[in-house]
Amino acid sequence: MKMFLDVMYDDTKNARKVKSSDYNNEGKYPIIDQGSKLIYGYTDELDGLYTDVPVIIFGDHTRRFKLIEEPFFIGADGTKVLKLRSLAYDYKFIYYYLLHQNIPDTGYNRHFKWVKEIEFPEIAHSIQCSIVKKLELLNNLISTKNELLRSLDVLIKSRFVELFGDIDCNTKNWPIITLENLAELITDGEHSTPKRCNEGIYLLSARNILNHSLKLDDVDYIDETEYSRISKRVIPKAGDILLSCSGSVGRCCVVPLEIKFQLVRSVALIRFKSDITPIFAEYMITSDWFQRQINSLKTASSQANLFQGRIKKLKGFVPDIYLQYEFIKVVNQINKLKFVQIVYN
């Protein structure tokens, strides 16, 4: 194994930074920073253009890696430009290898010190290239599958509009009612800091709430004593709706069967009355119509929030219950197709 600094070096000093105020939507050269998007802006500037490509970009705060193969400028602070020291390693191989390293999340701090502790295997260049080809083939297959899954999601949205109409215009004249009156319970998770442990009962936060599913590969835990204490506030049950209400606001999913967990404050819980079915509620909340309400009511700060008082002011609509059941059948059928694609293809 070879240490990181024997394989790569930090060449950030030779890359010119462009202020965010100088980003353009179009231009000759891309501006790369540590954010989630590959390219965050463009410029027609030439002075300071970094041309010694390829390079690997590392986000010192975000822990993101990017492989850049065309001349570029860098954006905000925290964008590291990493170069290989020799031709013994292939850039794409190193990039894929780095993507699969576990770099600790220490919040909005610098993380490059952890990257410098990474060790690389000593593998013949030809074998590296062979591995890269297989990984790229796999990535293409994954991209094709993901595109199909996205098209199935679009199909669900289309059926939602067909059954319930254009709610912006309320073409079917459904009753429009605040969530405060549609729900029998609206609350959120524990406000004080729970005592966490290494294993036990799930403690969910906003990062664990995705649209239509839970993300449990990066989750905290509490023990039975802490669970009992927090449960005095609320005990989540199957069919409740979970809504992320801090940071990335507005993601939601239905609580599935047979899962025991508690919540922190960044997750809201909505328990609708019997005239609103959970699956319908989930797709109503993720609709563009409802998300616009959320965006208009969430607090504008460095970290957006949408707490109980504002959640109660959000408005839903109440379609015929039999139409809701018909929609549930559609969702279940499409989810079966998704399952087949994920498992067997």
Question: Where are each of the predicted segments found?
Answer:
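Sequence-specific dsDNA recognition surfaces
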Residues: 2-53, 75-76, 180-193, 207-238
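Short coil/turn segments at secondary-structure boundaries
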Residues: 18-24, 109-112, 172-175, 192-199, ...
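A short beta-sheet element
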Residues: 33-99, 103-104, 205, 225-227, ...
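Interdomain signal-transducing alpha-helices
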Residues: 94, 122, 128-131, 281
